[in-house]
Amino acid sequence: KAGQKCTAVRRIIVPENLIDEVEKSIAQRLGKTTIGDPAQEGVRMGALATKTQVDRVRENVDLLSKSQKIVFGDLDGFEVMGADKKLGSFFSPILFRNNDPFKKTDCHDIEAFGPVSTIMPYKEIEDAVELAKMGKGSLVSSIVTPDDKEAREYVVGAASMHGRILVLNKDCAKESTGH
């Protein structure tokens, strides 16, 4: 779907002591993403819906780039397998990092509607709830934590802004298919 679904991950809110590790892990996974014709074996991400969508996603990436840093992805320097990059509507996955998400708020307001996400740190669970609410609502949110109390606090605090909340811990994460 190349990030073009209403439940695509747009904002990744991470405890500040884990953000470097999580960013590295996400970048490694994204680095293994093969872009191209989905009928080709090994391709993990196809094209955006239209060339107009490519232009819109690029415009939104340009806007987001004013307040945060791209830590993975390249708007032009990516390979496409089994298709013509110039004829198709292909787009590299982009991962931004926003170290000050309470002051640099574009990531909460701009939805690229493509393979674009922003990773951001929080200090306390209350901060994570507030950051989640700054997105002004979504169809789905997730929390991944081994702490049931923390999960409960997040769900109660963020529920009014999200259609559903997926709670994952080490036991149920193995079974989860995502959103």
Residues covered by each model-derived region:
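ALDH superfamily catalytic-core signature
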Residues: 1-102, 126, 130
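Conserved C-terminal structural/oligomerization subdomain of aldehyde/semialdehyde dehydrogenase
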Residues: 83-179
